[in-house]
Amino acid sequence: LCGLEKRCKGILEKEGTSYSSKQRLKICYMVMQDVNHQLFTESVLEEVLLSMPGKDSDESPENVAKAEAILTEMDLLPYKACHPMGLSGGQKQRVAIASAIASERPVILFDEPTSGLDLFHMRQVADSVKGLADSGKTIVIVTHDPEFILRCCNYVIHLENGRLEENYFLQDTEGRERLFNFFMMEGGGGNQTV
């Protein structure tokens, strides 16, 4: 979806506009399951500043204030001077999510965003992700976490071995029952992703 895999083919279309792989790299942001591959700077604050759009992504007072607000939302402000690699797995995950928020990209893909998160922070991240979607951003979440799905998703696509199995809305009881049945079935095995 983000245009990172050259061997994958397909079209991303948003609001009637089709995007090439190169264009997708500019409009998409991806939070990887293993965030250790996407943390590059010497501090948590610098990591968030790095993701901000434009060439003015420096430590101007305005950018720092915005970054600190995002870090506060992710419960990370006390760690702003810490090296990202010195944080716990869940804290690193939240730094990557904070960077995604700071990027202001219109399409954000989250791959297993709750890995390493405790219940409190999972709910906090779900609220932030829902806020991004409510602000008009397109959010795609790859996860096996039913509580996270129910807290911030409105549409589910089930993939099995790379093929579309089913898709549905979650706003009604039928959709929630389908999700519940999916996870009950998943417990029995299979290579399924939501």
Region locations from a protein language model:
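Catalytic Walker B motif of ABC-type/P-loop ATPase nucleotide-binding domains
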Residues: 108-111
